[in-house]
Amino acid sequence: MAKYDNQKQLKCSFCGKTQDQVKRLVAGPGVYICDECIELCQEIINEEFEEDMDMGIGELPKPKEIKEFLDQYVIGQEKAKKALAVAVYNHYKRINSRIKPDDVELQKSNILLLGPTGSGKTLLAQTLAKLLNVPFAIADATSLTEAGYVGEDVENILLKLIQAADYDIEKAEKGIIYIDEIDKIARKSENPSITRDVSGEGVQQALLKILEGTIANVPPQGGRKHPHQEFIQIDTTNILFICGGAFEGIEKIIESRIGKKSLGFGAEVQSRKEKDLSEILSHIMPQDLLKFGMIPEFIGRVPIVVTLDPLSKDDLVRILTEPKNALTKQYEKLFELDGVKLEFDKKALGLIADMALERKTGARGLRAILEEIMLDVMYEIPSSDNIEKCIITEETVLKKAPPTLVYSDAQKAKKKIKKTESVS
């Protein structure tokens, strides 16, 4: 408390009240502040902090807006996009809401994406993070092992997210983590074994806490944890985990369950070939995942299951041409920088889609196929003069003929003059 000076009565530099009008007067270099002004300043700071907390990730887009954004980058998968849009909206709405302790508790809902290789699982997760402007990290479940064994600890997944957020922990705590190949950590058999399953059930057990929400200790340099190192602490309660996997063979499990129920007098039994794979996957239930090898506790922490359809030829052609960052648009831009217009004819695009289907790589394999086709073209074109247009035809894709080249008027005139001279 500031000492009283008989010659000059002390006053608060903010409100002007004298020392005898307030409980406390704190002195600084040439200034004074009373307890009432300190309390008022504290209230202002608290209000601003609460406003910042309310803002969360900014203005949260509605489910329809989320789906419209996904439509720009992801072709097909309408049902999956709708389900993801609702799930993500509800997740971030839960984070942004200020719920009283005695109110209804909104539980966290992580997502499981189930679909064939190259159907768009990773792209969906990446695009969501891009729209919401939150940190995003991808982890491969196959590299994870239970603590104490050779491989990565599950906490290293969180380190990737922290790095994506430039070590801003508060920002990372609202990020998205995509765990790929989650089906590869399925339990090796339905019956518990004497030998420890360190890369299967053990990893599922290790993931449980971070999926549900916990204060995790993350080694700043990655690698294994040891007692004498410092840790980064991160709360995983509001991190959205999206797990993806092909779950090859799960359709047989679903079929056997549905088949048994449908059997009876006059029941029509269809063979697997007659059934559509996407239709079978749409009937997935938690018990099917359990039989596949996922443990009950893991299934409980990933309650939203979204199935993706296998991509058709038409889907692959659309993927090549329609999205904002479509592969053909990327090649067109590269050629445009050399002053050449690039075109793909419809038959060529159809053939590229057929090749991807044959390789069973889905949309992921399109880039590799295009690189094979375009290598010689991209090698020759920059060194050739006066080329106006390059057309990739069906024969080019089959490597039976080079692309059709259209030359500029100046080059055509030059060729015409040479031809006339040779005739004369």
Curated annotation (Swiss-Prot):
One of its GO terms (molecular function) is ATP hydrolysis activity. It holds the Pfam family zf-C4_ClpX. Gene3D superfamilies: 1.10.8.60, ClpX chaperone, C4-type zinc finger domain, P-loop containing nucleotide triphosphate hydrolases. Residues 1-53 form the ClpX-type ZB domain. GO terms for biological process: cell division; proteolysis involved in protein catabolic process. The keyword Heme does not apply. One of its GO terms (cellular component) is HslUV protease complex. Keywords: ATP-binding, Chaperone, Metal-binding, Nucleotide-binding, Zinc. SMART domains: AAA, ClpB_D2-small, zf-C4_ClpX. The keyword rRNA processing does not apply. ATP binds at residues 116-123. Zn(2+) binds at residues 12, 15, 34, 37. Belongs to the ClpX chaperone family. ATP-dependent specificity component of the Clp protease. It directs the protease to specific substrates. Can perform chaperone functions in the absence of ClpP. PANTHER family: ATP-DEPENDENT CLP PROTEASE ATP-BINDING SUBUNIT CLPX-LIKE, MITOCHONDRIAL (PTHR48102:SF7), ATP-DEPENDENT CLP PROTEASE ATP-BINDING SUBUNIT CLPX-LIKE, MITOCHONDRIAL-RELATED (PTHR48102). Component of the ClpX-ClpP complex. Forms a hexameric ring that, in the presence of ATP, binds to fourteen ClpP subunits assembled into a disk-like structure with a central cavity, resembling the structure of eukaryotic proteasomes. This is ATP-dependent Clp protease ATP-binding subunit ClpX. It comes from Thermoanaerobacter pseudethanolicus (strain ATCC 33223 / 39E).
